[in-house]
């Protein structure tokens, strides 16, 4: 058998140098590693990796070229109680694979064994890693580097955003190409968003349970290959990388940043009954958090948890993030279940991965957004992430809904959330932009569903409506469902307007869910993770154009208010904010805690937000001076107001002085 040259221990993965391919694989506990290459007929040839430096195995295959399909068989102990599950009968994906051929099917041969190893060979059905050659002309591409104070994030799904868009060419709808098409770029600019945050684009798999039910994982939070683009949204798997980069380049030219939702907390190997296709067979003990009995700590709810305190796994995570920044020019990341990143196993602000990111000149300068919780003990860590992380602020989400969709909430609590939750984020040198304010996100009700449904309706998910949260803080305004009489529809519209204004005129970084500006509904499904269909795809032909115009006007207004774009904490007497009651007097202590939901917020001494969140029409006395409503609140007849605004129930209006 032909032997490999020793090669080099870096760079990690499979690297083509024009004459052959260097292969590396991290495994601290392996005893032997075989590189397996496959020809066009599926015939397999095996080579031992001859080199080892520390915990990295390596070898060089002369004459190998891009397009070569490969995998690994890793030999070592089968000691489940100690966390070791080596099984050379199972072909394994390279964790650094830039492209993967084949899907992860629900197949018995992909199971590595539970108490005893499954020695049936799986090469015939296992996904294969593919060597690529990477050459791309970025031309004059430059990162927009939008300041946090001016950032407006738009969370979207690659397919769902454009699949039903009638103005896009049919063949590119629902693809990476569509993201950078002039029609979409023009829409983003007209709306005013500055950053497109994409649900996971790294290759993912549908869980076996979903496959057996005839469903698919739509959102993508079941990662299979962290360095490879999901191929389903490309014209061909070979073109995925370039088509994604074309979209990034087009968006950058328009000044729009691209943020990736990334899943550095678990893998699609799931629990011990899940498939063995990569990390479990390469070095289970190193890659995952293992309990004393050899099973997994399941702090993710997905069966396993990556051990991001292990030096080898920290290096893997950082190289993955750098790859997306350096190779694909993305501008930042939103980290799913990000508390896992700080587990040692307890959460620490100086956890190894946080320290590595902060020390990295590439990663420390891009936008980093944490979903600051996981499901393990001590997993809720809102406000506790170290700089330079921003965080999703669920306090804002819940407070905004409770304020406008009648629940008990004090004026003081609302004001605190409006002011970037300074009680949570004003620490460790962090600025207001660290609070990523949201009303809705991919998981949960859409904004329209928040005003149409009191209960979740997740029957289509096949779990008898048990999945999804029951804490929605929603209000159907008297009738469950989308329809209703005119007066009910008007009340729902007013609530949506008030919620959007609260989001887009609050201090902090606003995040808008794609489709909320259209009036998109998921018909009460608040956990549509497995609905790759019209329930989740945005219907552009049915979009509420008036709501889109209203949203765009709010974003333009936001960018005109220095108190919101300055990204500095508001201080007493600094001219940024004054909190007034309905009589234009400073709020009293009793009004902060017990008063009705009536207030005025004066920003930058010239923009006044008048709020009536009560159930009655109420006169609100404006501060001294001349005030005129500003778009989107100004009507055709927009007189100067010098005394009183008659605030409608659940109403909000913004005025400008002079």
From Swiss-Prot:
GO BP field: glycogen catabolic process
Swiss-Prot/TrEMBL catalytic activity: Hydrolysis of (1->6)-alpha-D-glucosidic linkages to branches with degrees of polymerization of three or four glucose residues in limit dextrin
Keyword line: Carbohydrate metabolism, Glycogen metabolism, Glycosidase, Hydrolase
Family matches, as InterPro entries: GlgX_C, GlgX_Isoamylase_N_E_set, Glyco_hydro_13_cat_dom, Glyco_hydro_13_N, Glyco_hydro_b, Glycogen_debranch_bac, Glycogen_debranch_GlgX, Glycoside_hydrolase_SF
GO molecular function annotation: glycogen debranching enzyme activity; hydrolase activity, hydrolyzing O-glycosyl compounds
Tagged with keyword Hydrolase: yes
UniProt site positions, description: Transition state stabilizer: 443
Pathway: Glycan degradation; glycogen degradation
Residues covered by region (Disordered): 459-484
Record-listed E.C. numbers: 3.2.1.196
SUPFAM superfamilies: (Trans)glycosidases, E set domains
Highest taxon of the lineage: Bacteria
Annotated active site: 336 (nucleophile), 371 (proton donor)
Region forming the signal peptide: none
EC supergroup of this enzyme: hydrolase
HAMAP family assigned to the protein according to its UniProt record, in alphabetical order: GlgX
Family from the record: Belongs to the glycosyl hydrolase 13 family.
Job description of the protein: Removes maltotriose and maltotetraose chains that are attached by 1,6-alpha-linkage to the limit dextrin main chain, generating a debranched limit dextrin.
Protein name listed in UniProt: Glycogen debranching enzyme
